[in-house]
Amino acid sequence: MMIEIGTTKYVIYAKVIVDGYVEKHDIIGAIFGQTEGLLGSDLDLRDLQKSGRIGRIDVELENINGKSYAKLIFPSSLDRVETAIIAATIETLDRVGPCIATIKVLNIEDIRIKKRQYITDRAKELLKSIVDTTIDTYEIAEEIKEFVRSEEIIEMGNEKLPSGPNVEDSDTIIIVEGRADVLNLLRCGIKNAIAVGGTSIPESIIELSKKKTTTIFTDGDRGGELILKEAIQTCDIDYVARAPKGREVEELTKKEVVKYLRSKIPIEQYIQFHSNKCNELLKKSKEYRSNTINNNNDSGKISIDSIISENATNDIGELPVSKTSKNERNNTKVIDENIEKNNQNIKEDNNIEIKQSDISEILKKDCSEQWEYIESLLNDISNTDNIKIITNDNIIKTIHYSELDKIDKSDIQMVMSDMPITQKITDLFHECSPIIIGRDINITKKPAKLKVFSHDMLKNMVCL
């Protein structure tokens, strides 16, 4: 049964059993008749109903086997004390007409609790609808930024390559694979990226690489490897950066983009890391670029696959750690032209400055055992960025390449590495005189007291 809530505060529920057949109006008449004058004029049911403080009394009646059963509903706008008094008064009813009757109050319901519950539930629904339809301020800002970034992408060259707005004016460029990569770098605030837009290197990028310092930043998959190989072959690449294996540049976060670009390495060091034929590659690559410029044809084109083996040292996505400065980059270019001469000069210097006994004293090994011992130490750090050092107390330590500038260099007798010895490493030890051993020697000048050896040079000397 539905009741009008209106100003109702409480609802009294009661049941009536009458020993005889009666109608609804008989029950209502008995209630008003038997309670009249019982509580005085203040709580008289007729007066309360006239004033609206007691609502319309609803009766649900059933007549079964000569008896009458009814449910009563009393809406009340009185306070809880007066409502309780009215409920108790109703229970004094003992007859309906000529029939014996009993009445029992079942419950007094506080309507305000239901109202509060309704308010709570409805407020939740309304709030949820507001939250679902509200656009977050961050989303608005990102949407606007995304639009601006997409507007910032320009088209360069006859091939209309997607690129950042600063490619023409910047001294450096970053070559990436596709438009999405350029867009992601724009999100990171990098505006000098240009996309290849396919698996072959466009002529516009080849020309740009001749004029600007060029970094190639490729995905960590097979496609990125192929583009990198062709770029090394056709462009004047200065640095190499790669996304982690199985990742793409377009999905990297800003922190990751900055991290991998900072970890870029010079092209010479990259090729040396992945092939023992690095000098041949550099020479042929340089000849190719020279022939392309002079003859404007493909007669000088070489196959990069024939120079960098598919099974080179590690996966091609793995790069040695390097934080090479611009000055060191310039020095590395000089090595291309003078590496054989420098290696010869360094070899002659070292033969004068170091004796067989120096190595024996450090390693505590006989001449016949020295190279095997050195080789075992080098095998421990093979294909890693780690370095072995031997202190003045003949303690052997393994450290990461990046920690070299943090250690006490005056306490070092020998440094062993599976990587090429660069100018940066020798500069770190310019005030000391340890023996430095590396796979190759890529330096243009050496401090007078420093003893620098490649693996082959040392092997030949200790095995004499």
From Swiss-Prot:
Pfam families with a match to the protein in the record: Toprim_4
Q: How is the cofactor bound?
A: Binds two Mg(2+) per subunit.
Required cofactor names: Mg(2+)
* Residue stretches making up the Toprim domain: 171-245
Biological process according to GO: DNA replication, synthesis of primer
Task: Give the binding site residues for Mg(2+) 1.
Answer: 177, 219
Catalytic activity, per the record? ssDNA + n NTP = ssDNA/pppN(pN)n-1 hybrid + (n-1) diphosphate
Q: Which Cys-Cys disulphide bridges does the record give?
A: none
Q: What is its EC number?
A: 2.7.7.101
Which top EC class applies here? transferase
Top-level lineage group? Archaea
Residues annotated to bind Mg(2+) 2: 219, 221
UniProt KW keywords: DNA replication, DNA-directed RNA polymerase, Magnesium, Metal-binding, Nucleotidyltransferase, Primosome, Transcription, Transferase
Q: Gene Ontology cellular component?
A: cytoplasm; DNA-directed RNA polymerase complex; exosome (RNase complex); primosome complex
MF-aspect GO terms: DNA-directed RNA polymerase activity; metal ion binding; poly(A) binding
What does the UniProt record say this protein does? RNA polymerase that catalyzes the synthesis of short RNA molecules used as primers for DNA polymerase during DNA replication.
The UniProt entry's sequence similarity note says:
Belongs to the archaeal DnaG primase family.
The record's note on quaternary structure and interaction partners says: Forms a ternary complex with MCM helicase and DNA.
Its name, as the record gives it, is DNA primase DnaG
Origin species: Methanococcus aeolicus (strain ATCC BAA-1280 / DSM 17508 / OCM 812 / Nankai-3)
